[in-house]
């Protein structure tokens, strides 16, 4: 088993393994004649082939049929699965600590956990990304995603930190 941290943010997904390997990919997917391409390769073709590209699949992670049919993806979960497979392929028997944004809905988290299990990878824990990144003196944490930002208010009691509230700020993303 190789322990790794997988941080989910549709602007930049980060995978950091205990063996020192780090992988960063943007949340873009592109359908070509061989299958789904993700990350920077998909980002580079998004401008020339927008009808075959998607950058909303992490933000809108679901199993609803795509408006435009693609040969290798029925829904956003297929695109997320392809990207997870690509990212985790280099790690032998991954055991993941999953860092997710507060904006992830319960249904989306359920889909994500199922996708990771199908890769296959083992999940050893799930933590809110704001809690993982914040220092004890931080009261607010702003995570900027591709399509939105999430402002998380943190509460510190002694050595413990917890989330008191979070707010999604639509259209305040990188895109």
Feature annotation, model-predicted:
Residues 74-83, 115, 167-175:
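Glycine/Thr-rich phosphate-binding loops that ligate phosphate moieties of nucleotide
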Residues 32, 36, 50-53, 71, ...:
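N-terminally biased helix-coil "hinge/interface" segments that flank
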Residues 1-25, 29-30, 135-166:
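Gly/Thr-rich phosphate-binding beta-strand-loop-beta motif of the actin/hexokinase/Hsp70
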Residues 12-99, 104-108:
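Conserved phosphate-binding loops in N-terminal lobes of ATP-dependent enzymes
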Residues 98, 123, 150, 154-157, ...:
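Extended hydrophobic/Leu-rich segments
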Residues 83-84, 117, 138-140:
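Charged linear interaction tracts used for macromolecular binding and regulation
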Residues 93-133:
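Glycine-rich phosphate-binding loop and adjoining helix at the ATP-binding site
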Residues 41-42, 165-168:
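Short clusters of small/polar residues that mark proteolytic maturation junctions
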């Amino acid at each position: 088993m190789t322990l790794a941290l997988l941080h989910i943010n549709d602007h930049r997904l980060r995978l950091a393994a205990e063996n020192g390997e780090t992988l960063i990919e943007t949340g873009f997917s592109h359908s070509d004649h061989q299958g789904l391409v993700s990350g920077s390769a998909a980002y580079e073709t998004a401008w020339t082939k927008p009808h075959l590209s998607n950058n909303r699949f992490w933000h809108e992670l679901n199993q609803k049929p795509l408006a435009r049919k693609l040969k290798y993806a029925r829904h956003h979960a297929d695109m997320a699965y392809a990207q997870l497979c690509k990212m985790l392929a280099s790690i032998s028997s991954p055991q993941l600590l999953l860092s997710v944004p507060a904006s992830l809905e319960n249904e989306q988290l359920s889909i994500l956990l199922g996708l990771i299990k199908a890769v296959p990878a083992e999940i050893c824990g799930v933590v809110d990304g704001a809690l993982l990144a914040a220092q004890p003196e931080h009261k607010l944490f702003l995570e900027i995603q591709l399509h939105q930002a999430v402002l998380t208010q943190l509460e510190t009691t002694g050595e413990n930190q917890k989330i008191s509230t979070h707010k999604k700020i639509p259209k305040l993303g990188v895109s």
